[in-house]
Each structure stands twice: as structure tokens, then as C-alpha cells.
Amino acid sequence: MSRQTTIPLRERNIILIGFMGAGKTTIGQLVAKKLYRDFIDVDAEIERRQGMSIPELFAQKGEAYFRKVERELIVDLCTNTRLKILSLGGGAYLQEDVRRACLAHGIVFFLDLSWEHWKEERLPLIVDSRPVLKNKTLEEVEQLFFQRQSAYALHHSRVVLNELEAEQAAEQIVESIKWTWDVYEPNR
């Protein structure tokens, strides 16, 4: 598929962004099931292709290498695939090339939640599994959370997750997508 090709809305990949631990993978799997699409967790795909976990990749090859692999994969998926649900790692969308490809070729949903909710509900579940959090104080993690918000603000739609269960968030995304299809491509 050429970069100049305009992808019909109904065929565009649906891309989920947000801070680590927001629930992108869980919600993405639910959305994929509801829309009968394939689901791709970008971090899991990187692990599969590299033959090692993300923490191992960070330790052995460094963050710069990981970000390069991540960027190349996401840009390729955005420009050369259709009808997928993509879940991006929390830091992926900070890269300009990734943002540009996602916004141009997909429908980007920001899965948002407050710092307080994330700190109380999500941090305890993920703190040991995320290389970016390793050896960071709570204040440093909070700073990282708020630094990323400006990149996440560049999206097509936002879902606030604070009080939503994953199923409710997925349903909200699906309803939003279907409404968009009906309004902008009613005869397809």
C-alpha cells in the first residue's frame, strides 16, 4: 500500500495509546473481538520478533535500540496493514514518526486516566515488569506521567478510564467507531 493511498475509515487500523498499565492490551483485545478484527500488541510482537522480553531487550540492547525497532514496526503496521486493532507501548507514541503514521493512517484512541487513579490502581500491578519504571521514585514516575500527556493529547478520540471497567471502555470505543463510520462513510 502506497503512503499516498487514502484508507477508507472502515478499513483503518484502530490504535490505542496511553500511559503504561492503562489497559490498552485488555481493552484492545475486547475491541478486536467486538469488531471481528485481528489484535496486535506491539510490545508482544516486538518480543516475538526479537526472541526476548522487553526487559531483556532493554538490558541487552538498550532503550535506543528498542525505540528504533518499535518505531519501524509501528510505522510499517500503520502504512501497510488494515483492519487491525493496535495496542502501543506507553512510550511509543512519544516518537514523532509514530504519531505521524498513527494519525495519518489510523484512528487513534487515547485511553486516559488520572494520576491518582493510575498511582493507586495500576502502579502496584506493573511496577516490577516495566523497565522504564526501574529505580525510579514515585515523584519521577509522576513527572514521566505528566510529561507524556502532551504527546497523548494528539489523538482522534479520548476515553477516560477512571471509573470504567475494560468491557465498558471497549464498548465506548466500538460505539464511537460505528458512529464515525455511519457519519463519514454511511453508504459502505
Swiss-Prot record:
Q: One of this protein's Pfam families, by short name? A: SKI
**GO annotation, biological process:** amino acid biosynthetic process; aromatic amino acid family biosynthetic process; chorismate biosynthetic process
**Residues bound to substrate:** 43, 67, 90, 148
Q: What is its EC number?
A: 2.7.1.71
Q: Which reaction is catalysed here?
A: shikimate + ATP = 3-phosphoshikimate + ADP + H(+)
**Chief localization:** cytoplasm
Q: Which CDD domains match?
A: SK (cd00464)
How the cofactor is bound: the record states: Binds 1 Mg(2+) ion per subunit.
Decide whether keyword Thylakoid is in the record: no
Q: Cofactor(s) for this protein?
A: Mg(2+)
Gene Ontology CC terms: cytosol
Q: Which class of enzymes does this protein belong to?
A: transferase
Q: Where in the cell is it found?
A: Cytoplasm
The residues listed in the UniProt record as binding ATP, with positions renumbered to this chain, are 21-26, 130
Offer an example of a GO molecular function term for this protein. shikimate kinase activity
Q: Which residues bind Mg(2+)?
A: 25
The job of this chain, per UniProt, is described as: Catalyzes the specific phosphorylation of the 3-hydroxyl group of shikimic acid using ATP as a cosubstrate.
Record text on subunit structure and interactions: Monomer.
Protein name (record)? Shikimate kinase
The gene name on file is aroK
